[in-house]
């Protein structure tokens, strides 16, 4: 069992990483007998994990209600959020309730935002079941739902009480979802840790094969890096946390334009990271050699390195200008400077961005 702390003063919380965690009543120790819990999951995960987690909670004499949502990015919406509120109210959940997000990034983001809003804020616990959620979205308190005009546009910074990573969940993860999570893993190496990037180059085959030792190390290192960044810049005020958005400005444009769920988040971020690398090259701030290292590693993870074939470069910028990093009408992009380091830039001309996107086309739709 591994434990990492996200250090935020009184709001600090643990990330626990272990196999079989969902079967362990002691893992829910902060909850007390008789307390209410609302388990939020989706129709795909409910048959796999809902009964197991409910039984574990009931062993600890915790009162459990559940809400089962449709599965998919397109359901990370205000209307589905309202379904969670309705379930809480119909079951008379009061301010001392705890919401548990049992799922991937969609469930975690939506449940966290529900917790931030319900009766002005209730406790919630992240139980991430996808690699992407385990290494990234479950840690750091970013909660949100999507809007037709943009991804994660309606949300709040709201930290969980704890994050419980059960490595056994990866055994049921579809290959495409595993690759999607690996995009966020690779991102950490590009922006923060060149040694970790090199380790990924040496161990990608083991990760794809779900080697226990390699995967445990990978998840632990990603959570350590994310925890350090969140502790230093929780609400993206200094620019440090914004570096975690490498590839996301391009990637969110792809997700929004193509329709939520057509491209998985990690797939869009993967193509976006190559676009960011090409942009950095065009301003002579990144090497072709490092770009090729990124492309090779993404391809080994079975990820796209080009944008959608039917999305022209001019379709990107309107979405990118709605990005949450835009300030005073200026596009701000996270660009790598070398493997292991990145900068937040606000001086990139739009024609440079378009030229970089052009270099990353075409790609057959997924």
Curated annotation (Swiss-Prot):
Keyword Lyase included in the entry's annotation: yes
Reaction catalyzed: 7-phospho-2-dehydro-3-deoxy-D-arabino-heptonate = 3-dehydroquinate + phosphate
InterPro entries: Dehydroquinate_synthase, DHQ_synth_AroB, DHQ_synth_fam, DHQS/DOIS_N, DHQS_C
The protein's annotated pathway: Metabolic intermediate biosynthesis; chorismate biosynthesis; chorismate from D-erythrose 4-phosphate and phosphoenolpyruvate: step 2/7
Keyword Amino-acid biosynthesis (UniProt): yes
Predominant subcellular localization, coarse grouping: cytoplasm
UniProt-annotated binding residues for Zn(2+): 184, 248, 265
Cofactor: how bound: Binds 1 divalent metal cation per subunit. Can use either Co(2+) or Zn(2+).
MF annotations from Gene Ontology: 3-dehydroquinate synthase activity; metal ion binding; nucleotide binding
Top class in the EC scheme: lyase
Positions of NAD(+) binding: 71-76, 105-109, 129-130, 142, 151, 169-172
Keywords recorded for this protein, A-Z: Amino-acid biosynthesis, Aromatic amino acid biosynthesis, Cobalt, Cytoplasm, Lyase, Metal-binding, NAD, Nucleotide-binding, Zinc
EC number: 4.2.3.4
Gene Ontology CC: cytoplasm
GO biological process terms, semicolon-separated: amino acid biosynthetic process; aromatic amino acid family biosynthetic process; chorismate biosynthetic process
Locations listed in the record: Cytoplasm
Essential cofactor(s): NAD(+); Co(2+); Zn(2+)
Family from the record: Belongs to the sugar phosphate cyclases superfamily. Dehydroquinate synthase family.
NCBIfam families referenced in this protein's UniProt entry, alphabetically: aroB
Function description: Catalyzes the conversion of 3-deoxy-D-arabino-heptulosonate 7-phosphate (DAHP) to dehydroquinate (DHQ).
Protein name, UniProt field: 3-dehydroquinate synthase
